[in-house]
């Protein structure tokens, strides 16, 4: 596996390697990330990953400084999975000067759910992804990027950005990797204490119960969502949201036929102790 830090070196290598399949990450890799690398190997001529902890998508009180950085372990995992090229830019490589031009995503999609509780998050995500796409796909004129469904709203926002800017990038969605008890794999799971880890699967269970109740029409959706929030709170969590949305645009479904038959997704975010977890379930 080759490792490069500068955009110029990245583009020079990729100028003769065909169509890249790209997996952007912030490092601290787990099997969820590695499953995306495995998918990338099926969708391009060269599998490229990046590791960059993007300051722009963290709020001032969030964990940018303490976010786990596990460079040597990450490199070993990527090489074992057959990643061909790792792009690991320094902050000065991606942001050589203050980033005054930023991507402002569609508010209807990006200012809800995660965007409501983490204002500016998707502006930071879209800005860094656009810069990464420019670096990775410049030489080939396009390729594939693989994003996980675990960050469902992020996947939707990136897809919309690609559509709006007519970028020559095919977005492939990778399924959420889970532990044996159903907990979605996340780099932030490492923040959980042993006791919290035993309780952490409650979020995925709450989403499953919400999805089942919503599809069965057991009560108006707002009541079911409130019940799910209360149920999780009673177990010691601090939920931000548990909600059912249309998969196509993350807007609330109408009661009745649309709720009964449309492709839906249950999404949730909640804090257990000091750790904020997110998850989702398509149904």
Curated annotation (Swiss-Prot):
The reaction proceeds by a bi uni uni bi ping pong mechanism. One of its GO terms (molecular function) is pantoate-beta-alanine ligase activity. This is Pantothenate synthetase. Its main location: cytoplasm. One of its GO terms (biological process) is pantothenate biosynthetic process. CDD domains: PanC. It is an enzyme of class 6 (ligase). Coiled coil: none annotated. Keywords: ATP-binding, Cytoplasm, Ligase, Nucleotide-binding, Pantothenate biosynthesis. One of its GO terms (cellular component) is cytosol. Catalyzes the condensation of pantoate with beta-alanine in an ATP-dependent reaction via a pantoyl-adenylate intermediate. Belongs to the pantothenate synthetase family.
């Amino acid at each position: 596996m080759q490792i490069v830090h500068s955009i110029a070196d990245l583009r020079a290598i990729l100028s003769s390697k065909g169509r890249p399949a790209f997996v952007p990450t912030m490092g601290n890799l787990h099997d969820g990330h590695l499953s995306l690398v495995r998918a990338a190997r099926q969708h391009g001529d060269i599998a490229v990953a990046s590791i960059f902890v993007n300051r722009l998508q963290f709020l001032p009180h969030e964990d940018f400084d303490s976010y786990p950085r596990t460079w040597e372990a990450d490199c070993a995992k990527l090489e074992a999975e057959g990643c061909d090229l790792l792009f690991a830019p320094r902050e000065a490589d991606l942001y050589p000067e203050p980033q005054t031009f930023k991507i402002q995503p569609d508010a209807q999609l990006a200012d809800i759910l995660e965007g409501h509780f983490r204002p500016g998050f998707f502006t930071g995500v879209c800005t860094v992804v656009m810069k990464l796409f420019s670096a990775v796909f410049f030489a080939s004129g396009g390729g594939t990027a693989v994003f996980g469904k675990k960050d469902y709203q992020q996947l939707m926002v990136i897809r919309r950005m690609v559509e709006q800017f007519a970028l020559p990038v095919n977005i492939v969605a990778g399924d959420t990797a889970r532990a044996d008890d159903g907990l979605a794999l996340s780099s932030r799971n490492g923040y959980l204490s042993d006791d919290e880890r035993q309780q952490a699967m409650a979020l995925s269970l709450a989403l499953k119960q919400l999805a089942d109740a919503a599809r069965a029409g057991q009560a108006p959706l707002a009541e079911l969502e409130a019940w799910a929030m209360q149920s999780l709170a009673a177990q010691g969590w601090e939920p931000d949201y548990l909600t059912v949305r249309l998969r196509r645009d993350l807007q609330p479904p109408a009661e009745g036929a649309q709720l009964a038959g449309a492709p839906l997704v249950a999404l949730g975010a909640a804090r257990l102790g000091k750790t904020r977890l997110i998850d989702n379930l398509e149904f």
